[in-house]
Every structure is written in C-alpha cells, then in structure tokens.
Amino acid sequence: MIVDRQGRRFRNLRISLTSACNYACTYCVPNGKRLVAAQDELSAEAMARGVAYLIEAAGIDRLRITGGEPLVSPKLEAFMGAVGQMGLSDISLTTNGQLLARKLPLLVDAGLKRINVSLDTLDADAFRSIARGGDLATVLDGMDQARAAGIKIKVNMVPLRGQNLDQVMPLLDYCLERGYELRFIELMRMGHLAKDSNAFLQQFVSLQQLLSLIGEHHEYLQANAPVDATAVRYEVPGKGFFGVIANESVPFCRTCSRLRLSSTGWLHGCLSSSNRHYVGDLLDQPRHQALPALQGLLMKALGDKQEVAFSGGATIMKIIGG
C-alpha cells in the first residue's frame, strides 16, 4: 500500500470510460460543442486490466465509472462484465440519465447497485438551457425504473446563481419524496472557470448559502459520514438525507483518497494539479512487468495531491469524469 505523509492513500478509483457526452452543459463546455470520443481511447480490455493492476498496486477497492457519459460508450458492457469479477467492495456509475432506461437491463445484469444521476433542475426550460441536450422526462423515467429495479440512486445538482437556484427546493423535495439522496456540488474552478474568476463568482453558490435557503423550508441535522467522504451530509428528520460537496467552502484535500484514470490512459492524482502520468503502455504489458513501473507512477500521483485546499485546475471535467 502506498501512503503519503498526510496518511492518504488511493482507495477510490474513478475511471472515465469515454470523453464523449450527449450533453454540452454550460459549466462544463461553455462553447456548447459536445465532446466526442478521443481517437486514442483505451479498449475495454485495457481499462479492465488497468483496474486489476491498480487493485494490486495501490489497494483500490472502490470503483466509480464516469465519462463523459459512460452510457454512450460501446465499451460499457464488456468493461462492467470484467470489473464485476474483481472482488471490489463497491462499483458505482455516474450518468446524466438520458440513456438510463435503455441501458438498465445491462446495468442490472452486471450487478450494479448504485448510480449517481446528474440533474440540475426539474424545470424543462432550464434543463434545456443548462444541459443543451436530452429530455428531462426521459431522465426522470429512467430514474424511476432504476429505483424499481432495486438500484440506489443519488442525484448530483450543481447550483448556479442566475440559472437554477430556484430549483434547489423543488429538486430536494422531489428527491426526499422518492428516497433519492440529493448531492449539491459547489461549482468548481475547473476548465474555463479556472481562468475566469468573474464567471466563476457570478455563478458560485456556497455551502452556507445553500444551507440558509434549505433552512427556510426544512429543519436539518448534520449526519455522520466516512472520514474520506467528499460530502458534508445532513438529515431531514423523518424524510431523508442530502449532502453538499463543498470543495470551496469545506475543502477535503487532507483526506482525499481518489485516483482518476482517463479514457486515454492518463492517471490524475489531484484535480488541482496539472500533472498527469501516462499508464496506457503499461496496460499492454504482463503483470510482472507493469506493476513495478505502475507503483512508481502512483507515488508521483499521490505526491500531486494538495495538502490543504483545492485551488482549481485547467482540465475539463468531462475528460476525467468528475
């Protein structure tokens, strides 16, 4: 196991199955151009081998499948079939939900138990304005079908001043009624927002601002969460839970256990670091040759982690999967 001087280790792997996405969300790709799959994306077999090697080299035991949008990838079935046999303690997936109903049989057959659905509003007009793709009713129907199939659902919402702040309470109440756990995600200084402070501040909604708004409608109590959790979690007594991933207001860098692998074979140890480490060539090598070199790169990736607080990063989130 590789541990740094802060006592941090890699435990959670987020793997971007593809950079392609069927949305073009305003806070992710401001030019409105949908991202497509990179020409040099790894195969499903190479990605699965990467997971197996990282389990052994770093002690990874939790996997989240991201994108882009993972449900648009033709690699999904083969990849999930492979990683489902690796003994991981948890496998989850983040999706925009547009293809959820269509892909649900595949996900159920693969044994998936948890999904996070990115959904920023229940208003159809605001949905079209923010996502610039897809259909709201299709997403909601997919979520209902997934819940009926026994899959646990969390909803990710990015509150944006001037765009969807009026949707905080409708979406929270919607989730509480259906047993979904809503996660508010503070806007992050990533991609174009790392360079444009004015654009960031004009849209940013803080943890305290969110709690003040929610407190006008619901009583809530802070709930327990794992030490390396990204979200500050709250309980609405008798109704359910919500969380806030408050990377600006309450940085969690000191306990971060996340490692990211892009669809093109780059390891990212920290979203706030411009450093990345190419492992694509190692994934074509036999285990006994790949592991020593991989462990060296993991040491470097762990050294990239910030000690105190997130300071932003130039990478587009869609490329490395949030």
Give residue ranges: language-model regions.
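Canonical Radical SAM [4Fe-4S] cluster-binding loop centered on the CxxxCxxC motif
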Residues: 5-45, 58
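Glycine-centered loop/turn positions within well-structured domains
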Residues: 23, 124-125, 251, 277
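A short acidic, helix-capping loop that chelates divalent metal ions and anchors anionic groups
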Residues: 33-37, 123-130, 191-197, 278-279
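Radical SAM/AdoMet-radical enzyme domain recognition
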Residues: 44-65, 69-185
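Short flanking/linker segments adjacent to small metal-binding domains or redox-active Cys/His motifs
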Residues: 69, 302-322
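Histidine- and/or cysteine-centered catalytic micro-motif in compact active-site loops
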Residues: 158, 185-189, 245-247
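Accessory C-terminal segments flanking Radical SAM cores
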Residues: 191-310
